[in-house]
């Protein structure tokens, strides 16, 4: 890849760590508390209607996450045509959330942190937020990650309030959901599962007590 293409890509893939609430102080070493969020029918905001999110707590009772069932239909190489390694990425880019839509984030399957500013979501699964780290993932292990434009962030205690208002079902985090090849039916599938949980159906999953009441 030529020098111009690489520099343009790194400008577009912003070093956003300092802009992401709760991510500037440290990377999370203990992934306990990561959850799958399933939008309930009460949630009518177009950004979140029918959405499934992977969310993780960070510092100061904040949470961040990405929407995992919204493929954009655009390839990474179509967004960055001068960035040759992007052509190796097979899956489409996903819409991760309404915040920082100009930035690319990655959820990567790897047995160690991929680089500075990355947050461990669960065992061998990390959210990469810095542009240089995302760039490195694309160049070295392009198909061990899923790439997102934008992300979701909650202020301290905000997600707890949304759950209490009945906007989200909360299920255990599942890394397999992130890499589903066809997520078109994922929301309906998890909605049925979540309703079975709340109804006390035999064989139900446990709802995760993931949020502080503070």
What are these regions (language model features)?
Residues 1-12:
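Bacterial N-terminal signal peptides that target proteins for export
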Residues 4-6, 21-24:
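Intrinsic disorder/low-complexity segments
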Residues 10-21:
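Bacterial N-terminal signal peptides
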Residues 25-214:
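A short aromatic-anchored loop/beta-hairpin motif
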């Amino acid at each position: 890849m030529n020098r111009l293409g690489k520099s343009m890509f790194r400008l577009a893939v912003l070093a956003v760590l300092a802009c992401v609430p709760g991510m500037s102080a440290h990377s999370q070493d203990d992934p306990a508390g990561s959850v799958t969020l399933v939008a309930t029918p009460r949630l009518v905001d177009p950004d979140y209607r029918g959405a499934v999110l992977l969310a993780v707590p960070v510092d100061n009772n904040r949470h961040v996450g990405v929407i995992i069932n919204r493929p954009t239909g655009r390839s990474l190489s179509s967004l960055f045509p001068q960035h040759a390694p992007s052509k190796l990425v097979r899956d489409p880019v996903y819409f991760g959330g309404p915040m920082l839509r100009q930035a690319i984030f990655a959820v990567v399957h790897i047995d160690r942190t991929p680089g500075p500013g990355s947050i461990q979501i669960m065992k061998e699964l990390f959210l990469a937020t810095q542009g240089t780290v995302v760039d490195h993932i694309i160049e070295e292990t392009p198909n061990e990650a899923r790439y997102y434009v934008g992300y979701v962030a909650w202020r301290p205690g905000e997600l707890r309030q949304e759950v209490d208002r009945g906007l989200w079902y909360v299920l255990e985090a599942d890394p397999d959901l992130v890499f589903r090849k066809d997520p078109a039916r994922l929301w309906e599938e998890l909605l049925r599962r979540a309703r079975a949980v709340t109804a006390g159906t035999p064989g139900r999953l446990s709802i995760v007590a993931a949020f502080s009441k503070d």
